[in-house]
């Protein structure tokens, strides 16, 4: 447990710029477990804090996201909004994202679990989490934002020192 706390501190504070003692977590066995755990935690957050029903909660992620995201949707009985990406840069189509969010609201979706990738497994694409959050905030929607950094998390923060994909961004919660 002491080693785990030390590793968490290095990752959270030194790599991802969290405030000291502002984080919690554990070392997962892999990215699949970490993603499922994050989505499970957020589903329970919405259920416990907003009395949300599972059918009111939806996961949003790109079509290039890790297979663990649709798996989590299946395990936790949540819908998944799969957002298409551009062919060349593999970045989400923001206009489709907005249309899908608007359509989800008409289908009684009130709570959004966003998974933004810090390096997709197949292409290494780094998504801008603000693309998701700007639209959700435009419509004043409740959301939680998870960064899937299983693939790029040990490279991207060091290769892009100016990145804002870290815990200095108050919108990112895991």
Language-model region placement:
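Conserved N-terminal alpha-helix of the aminotransferase class I/II PLP-enzyme fold
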Residues: 1-31, 45, 49
């Amino acid at each position: 447990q002491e080693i785990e706390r030390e590793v968490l501190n290095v990752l959270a504070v030194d790599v991802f710029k969290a405030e000291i003692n502002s984080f919690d977590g554990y070392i997962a066995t892999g990215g699949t477990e970490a993603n499922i755990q994050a989505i499970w935690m957020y589903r329970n957050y919405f259920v416990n804090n907003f009395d949300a029903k599972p059918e009111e909660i939806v996961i949003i992620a790109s079509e290039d996201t890790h297979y663990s995201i649709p798996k989590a949707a299946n395990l936790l009985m949540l819908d998944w909004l799969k957002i298409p990406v551009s062919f060349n840069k593999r970045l989400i189509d923001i206009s489709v994202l907005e249309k899908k969010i608007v359509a989800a609201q008409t289908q009684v979706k009130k709570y959004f679990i966003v998974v933004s990738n810090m390096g997709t497994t197949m292409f290494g694409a780094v998504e801008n989490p603000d693309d998701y959050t700007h639209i959700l905030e435009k419509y004043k929607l409740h959301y939680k934002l998870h960064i899937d950094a299983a693939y790029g998390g040990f490279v991207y923060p060091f290769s892009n020192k100016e990145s804002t994909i870290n815990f200095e961004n108050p919108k990112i919660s895991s």
